Amino acid sequence: MKRLMIKTLVAAAALAIAGVAAAQEKTFKFGLQNPKGHPLEMGAVKFAELVAAKTGGRIKVNVFAGGVLGGDAANVSALQGGTIEVLMLNSGILASQIKDFEVYDFPFMFAGAREADAIVDGPFGQKLHARLADKGIVGLAYTELGFRNITNSRKPINTVDDIAGLKLRVIPNAINVDWVKALGANPTPMAFPEVYAGLEQKAIDGQENPLSVILANKFYEVQKNLAVTNHQYNPQSLIFSKKVWDTLGDADRKALQDAANEASKYQRQVNRSKSADDLDELKKAGMQVTELSPAEQAKLRDKLKPVIEKHGAAIAGTVAELQAELAKLRK
């Protein structure tokens, strides 16, 4: 009888230990719009690998690339509800939550990668991410898409005036709609997973994205003209569900934050090293590449200044803070 009781207690203890271990194991979903092989997807995979390494495999992150979990707006709602744990998306899209994130969509804000890194990794970028907590979002780190360029199926763009009349897909927010209108083109807000079909079916003439996105999504199959305009730099936000974050212990939070910081640096390096190669690949794929002359580039900046002034008025404090930080960097 005594031996049976001991066996029963040992078995119960084993089950309890197993239950605790199982309870500590977690699997998170990581959604992003870019396909497998894109630098952002590579950054997401690196994050998953780092999280697994830092938690001894106890936390697993499954990456769902190519928009298979839905568009950005739906994904943000799911993240706030805790049904998707991790996202990587254009920081400007978060203007739907905190209007000040619109500043990341202003044309010609950053002169280069060095400035962008200093801003997003410094107090300015961290302060904006911290404000997301009130919206059920934890901002972990910034990655990048890079500088955006315009493609279309109708004509080469050699001058700013060539952009007029084109029906261009834009990220669904007000500033992107307005800068396209300022150039005399017709903006069409559209979720990213719909863009290829929209181009293929001629519902839109063109779109604008960094070279890596144009290549990875095979837009060259349905777009023959590429204008290297570098009109807008796109930081990306690596964000986490606060609803889930609040259930985690300090050690797990630290592992996730450290993994995000390391994956961010890795992703940017990969993206930048691929940029020149991407342009060559697009040329080989048959795209006709044009660049605006310095005079036309200046004309483009001038046409977009009223858009920046209009949208900057609503977030004047944030714009002034960013411009002050940029002024320090440019001394």
Language-model features, listed with the residues they occupy:
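N-terminal secretory/targeting leader peptides
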Residues: 4, 10-13, 24-115, 123-126, ...
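N-terminal signal peptide c-region/cleavage motif recognized by signal peptidases
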Residues: 18-20
